[in-house]
A protein has these predicted regions:
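Short beta-strand/loop segment that forms part of the nucleotide-sugar
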Residues: 25-29, 36-46, 63-65
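A short, conserved alpha-helix in the catalytic core of glycosyltransferases
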Residues: 156-160, 166-186
């Protein structure tokens, strides 16, 4: 899955995510066949599943990195060779029209970053509320989270300083830097919606998980250490698995 003429390098951080990747890799392979996707970079944080073999089997580039999504994304983006980066979580599901939305942005908004609208694989009222809040937050405050994906031109990514090598809040740090570097207009919403897993909300409860997300963001804004936040957020002795970090709230 490599075409040096295509513009888009897709970077996916993983941690024991081999079983969940197939539904994401299939549309990316279609994007490669269409001349949009240049490469897929899997930035792994020390999985004990067969992710390396899976990457080799589908023609993706495998990058081993220290565990922690910020560190993995920093390594994956450093290894990527395309003029555009698309960062996706392993449990993201792309819509049928994703290629058109991404290609349109690349053609008409070459200096700006973009994110997808969000929904969950759950059609309950709490799921719709949390996704609606995430989309409103992104529009009003220019603050999409990582599970909405991030499409960014390499020059803007580099000017903004790239992903910080921290365990949590790496997505917030980067979009904050993009706004400071290039202004609010440099962060746009794509005209389509990705779907992400609601498992973490179903496990913890929609209210509890949403409140925890907001409290974590507030503590970060007040200067809390991201490593301490990650430990408190995920619980002592539990790691930050890919696709199981903060959600739409």
């Amino acid at each position: 899955m490599s075409d040096a003429r295509a513009p888009l390098s897709v970077v996916i951080p993983t941690l024991n995510a081999a079983a969940s990747l197939a539904p994401l890799l299939a549309p990316l392979a279609e994007g490669a066949a269409a001349g949009l996707v240049r490469e897929v970079v899997i930035a792994d944080g020390g999985s004990d599943d067969d992710i390396a073999a899976l990457a080799e089997g589908v023609g993706a580039r495998f990058v081993a990195a220290p565990r922690g999504r910020g560190r993995q994304l920093s390594a994956g983006c450093a290894a990527a060779g395309g003029p555009w980066l698309l960062i996706l979580h392993a449990d993201t599901r792309l819509p049928a029209d994703w290629q058109g939305a991404v290609a349109d942005h690349i053609e008409h908004h070459g200096g700006a970053a973009a994110y997808f609208r969000l929904r969950f694989d759950d059609r309950s009222a709490p799921a719709r509320f949390v996704a609606g809040w995430a989309n409103l937050r992104s529009r009003l405050f220019g603050l999409p989270y990582g599970d909405q994906g991030l499409l960014v031109p390499r020059p803007l990514y580099d000017r903004a300083g790239g992903y910080p090598e921290i365990a949590l809040m790496e997505d917030v740090v980067l979009v904050d830097a993009i706004r400071r570097t290039a202004g609010r207009g440099a962060l746009r919403s794509l005209a389509t919606t990705v779907e992400t897993s609601a498992e973490r909300y179903r496990r913890d409860g929609w209210v509890k998980r949403g409140a925890r997300n907001l409290l974590t963001l507030l503590r970060w804004r007040l200067g809390a250490d991201p490593e301490a936040l990650a430990a408190a957020y995920e619980g002592r002795g539990r790691g930050l698995g890919q696709g199981q970090g903060r959600g739409g709230a």
